[in-house]
Amino acid sequence: MSLTDPVADFLTRIRNAIRARHQKLDVPASKLKAEIARILKEEGYIANYKTTEEEGRAILRVYLKYGSNNEAAIRDLSRVSRPGCRVYIGRDEIKRVQGGLGISIMTTPRGVMTGRQARREGVGGEILCEVW
């Protein structure tokens, strides 16, 4: 099965796993998905992630994070830039997500980073998604 938007599929799988209270989820691996998972781990939204190989295919295993009252660290995820409607912004147009309580994940000429990092480094790029 070919996907037209693998990042949206990745975010949807995370959203569905959180709603079903799963501890982990497996998705087909890619470099971009691994970078998104790295940022989510650095920002404290997931517990961990690792890339493994099963049946000859690369798998990205994401371990979700829940609080003491079984509340997920991720409240919601939304895809911003889509294959049919790319959203590019300059360094001066980067806005805070949910009043600073969330993050935006961007691809820039310097790699995948949060909107906060891009603002600090003075680079713009494509907004992939927002997480809060």
From Swiss-Prot:
Keyword Ribosomal protein: yes
GO molecular function: rRNA binding; structural constituent of ribosome
Keywords: Ribonucleoprotein, Ribosomal protein, RNA-binding, rRNA-binding
InterPro entries in alphabetical order: Ribosomal_uS8, Ribosomal_uS8_sf
Pfam families, per the entry: Ribosomal_S8
Oligomeric and partner information: Part of the 30S ribosomal subunit. Contacts proteins S5 and S12.
Record's protein name: Small ribosomal subunit protein uS8
Species assigned in the record: Acidobacterium capsulatum (strain ATCC 51196 / DSM 11244 / BCRC 80197 / JCM 7670 / NBRC 15755 / NCIMB 13165 / 161)
Encoding gene (name): rpsH
